[in-house]
């Protein structure tokens, strides 16, 4: 590339030309690849592979337990935001892990002395329809389900008076999934307790889990058949306690989530987490925008590096602080060191269309973290808003005033993401994000279908049978005229497409 003198005596003062998604297109290649036949699986961390290379953002209007469950069932993964109390975030991890399992190895139980009201509250919390009943030593003495409680008026009655009492249909430890399914089918029951030789409950198998497995064949699961889930932590305040609680709750990935990860606090947190819980949880560091920052995270032990400073639609870091790097260039810089170390890159932010996801992966990222494209789905926790007969959902940056002030939830846990946890007066906060709304998009499954469909099309055009192949694709830099030509033009739009909207 020809370097243009920008003034001054230091030719390296302007480091390089920065490119983002609208500045490039993927060049088509000779191909015998059919989009429906491509393999979209890719690593999100050193040790975890997703069927679909999509991760939902750790934002309080994008990912809570409902979104995380839906993302994992679709083949991706959700990262639970940290603008919650430690207990609430850990509880959401538990909700995801308990939502689906081939065998529930630590089933929620109740005692014969619990009241129906207490059982109903537990069922609502964990979104389950019934509980095994165990005595003080853990021996199975009965089971109580919605069917037992449906017509009970007195919610103070003890479980022992309403439950279906032992002997129950059970199986011994070591039973195969096929044999368990046979018992469920023959006895027409929905729950099969697994007991040891002393009659103590060890595992619970439910028919719903078999049904869910059939309904969601791409679901990403751990070795115990539970859905994968990630969770975000910071560096300030009680973040170590938060990380330990999340690990104990069963999180598969912990992301040290900050606006600037090339910082000693972040690097130390990553290293400390790897030393303490690295044998059971993968640790991700972010966000960065330079190869030096990526290298620092690798040396700290990160299992993946998250790239993106300021590309998000709700982020104002680049104009408030004047800092960042266009996302394609940031990814290209990070992968120069990450690929050599075998560490995956997560491209976080700036994705407006499915084609941008393909570009991010072609630049070298292994997965893409998506925020605005998912904020409008039914599963996002954002508020549903009706404006002139059209539905929208609220969407805000974690650096917005609302997020840092805790508006809508009483207390903020996100200030330290922007290193402002020492700011005691709300009027002294310096926001690096905005609040807004996005169109309601319907169920997540439909949105993910379109996003993955666009990725598959890109893989077909570039002759890429796998994501690794796609990373070898080449770009062409385009002009403003080329971008204008890329979008629909010289026509009045009469019917909207599910995967395109004009800006």
Feature-to-residue mapping (PLM):
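Terminal amphipathic helices with adjacent charged low-complexity linkers/tails
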Residues: 82-97, 133, 137-153, 184, ...
């Amino acid at each position: 590339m020809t370097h243009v003198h920008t003034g001054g005596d230091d030719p390296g003062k302007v480091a390089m030309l920065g490119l983002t998604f609208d500045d490039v297109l993927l060049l088509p290649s000779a191909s015998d690849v059919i989009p429906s036949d491509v393999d979209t699986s890719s690593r999100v961390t050193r040790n975890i592979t997703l069927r679909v290379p999509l991760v939902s953002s750790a934002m309080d209007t994008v990912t809570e337990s409902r979104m995380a469950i839906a993302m994992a069932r679709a083949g991706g993964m959700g990262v639970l935001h940290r603008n919650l109390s430690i207990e609430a975030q850990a509880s959401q991890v538990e909700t995801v892990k308990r939502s689906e399992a081939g065998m529930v190895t630590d089933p929620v139980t109740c005692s014969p002395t619990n009241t129906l009201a207490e059982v109903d509250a537990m069922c609502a919390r964990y979104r389950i329809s019934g509980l095994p009943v165990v005595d003080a030593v853990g021996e199975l003495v009965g089971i109580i389900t919605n069917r037992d409680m449906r017509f009970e008026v007195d919610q103070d009655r003890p479980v022992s008076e309403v439950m279906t009492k032992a002997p129950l249909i059970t199986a011994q430890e070591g039973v195969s999934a096929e044999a368990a399914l046979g018992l469920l089918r023959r006895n027409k029951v929905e729950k099969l307790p697994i007991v040891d030789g002393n009659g103590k409950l060890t595992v619970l198998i439910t028919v719903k889990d078999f049904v869910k497995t059939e309904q969601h064949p791409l679901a990403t699961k751990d070795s115990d058949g539970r859905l994968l889930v990630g969770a975000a932590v910071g560096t300030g305040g009680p973040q170590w306690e938060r990380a330990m609680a999340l690990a104990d709750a069963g999180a598969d990935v912990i992301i040290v989530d900050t606006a600037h990860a090339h910082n000693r606090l972040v690097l130390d947190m990553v290293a400390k987490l790897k030393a303490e819980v690295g044998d059971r949880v993968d640790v991700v560091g972010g966000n960065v925008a330079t190869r030096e920052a990526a290298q620092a995270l690798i040396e700290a032990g990160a299992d993946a590096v998250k790239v993106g400073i300021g590309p998000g639609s709700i982020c104002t870091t680049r104009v408030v602080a004047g800092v960042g790097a266009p996302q394609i260039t940031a990814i290209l810089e990070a992968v120069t060191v990450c690929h050599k170390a075998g560490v995956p890159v997560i491209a976080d932010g700036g994705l407006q269309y499915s084609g941008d996801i393909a570009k991010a992966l072609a630049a070298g990222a292994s997965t893409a973290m998506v925020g605005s494209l998912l904020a409008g789905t039914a599963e996002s926790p954002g508020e549903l808003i009706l404006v002139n007969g059209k539905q929208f959902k609220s969407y805000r940056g974690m650096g917005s005033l609302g997020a840092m002030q805790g508006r809508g939830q009483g207390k903020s846990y996100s200030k330290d993401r922007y290193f402002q946890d020492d700011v005691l007066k709300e009027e002294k906060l310096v926001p690096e994000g905005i609040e807004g709304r996005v169109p309601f998009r319907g169920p997540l499954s439909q949105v993910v279908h379109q996003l993955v469909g666009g990725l598959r099309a890109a893989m077909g055009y570039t002759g890429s049978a796998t994501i690794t192949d796609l990373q070898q694709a080449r770009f062409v830099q385009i002009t403003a005229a080329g971008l204008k030509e890329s979008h629909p033009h010289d026509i009045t739009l009469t019917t909207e497409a599910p995967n395109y909207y004009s800006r």
